[in-house]
Amino acid sequence: MATESSESEEEGKISGGNYKLIIDDDLREMGKNAAWSVSSCKPGNGVTTLRDDNLETYWQSDGLQPHLINIQFQKKVKLQLVVLYVDFKLDESYTPSKISIRAGDGFHNLKEIKSVELVKPTGWVCLSLSGTDPRETFVNTFMLQIAILSNHLNGRDTHIRQIKVYGPRPNPIPHQPFQFTSMEFLTYSTLR
């Protein structure tokens, strides 16, 4: 899994963040396969800024809370990790403090799967979607919704600089010091 953000003793509270994003090789970024939408945005700070790989740009909501980010897939996918880049030092009252992550087949049946409280985060914040059961390492879903329920310092609108969504690789190869380059070699990579 990725390097987790520091989680306090109280379940669901996350403080800090990581300046460098480190993701395991057995995860892949799934956001490029999705249709992204937001509940509202200021002109010039739309949904594309969430995915442009630029930490200087940000999505800014424009309206009443909760602010919603919708991630819809054409087919059911396995998702394991949501990673946000937020910066309390730059954004102050625009920084999210309470976030709810919901999953489902569409808007009609979304269920909350994770609720977290961020405490002055700066950097990449990793939110694992795994359940309490150790066998539940991912969520199988058509849609993921990230709801910003409140901001720091009672701010109204929110800033999120980047979002990445990761799922397990379909056929992870056991950790080896090299990668096979041909399909023929790949077929002999494991024993039955």
Swiss-Prot record:
SUPFAM superfamilies listed in its UniProt record: Galactose-binding domain-like (SSF49785)
Residue ranges occupied by any DOC domain in the UniProt entry: 6-192
One Pfam family cited in the UniProt record for this chain: ANAPC10
Associated pathway: Protein modification; protein ubiquitination
TM region positions: none
Family: Belongs to the APC10 family.
Assembly with partners or alone: Component of the anaphase promoting complex/cyclosome (APC/C), which is composed of at least 10 subunits. Interacts with CDC20-1, CDC20-2, CDC27A and CDC27B.
PANTHER family according to UniProt: ANAPHASE-PROMOTING COMPLEX 10, ANAPHASE-PROMOTING COMPLEX SUBUNIT 10
Name assigned to this protein: Anaphase-promoting complex subunit 10
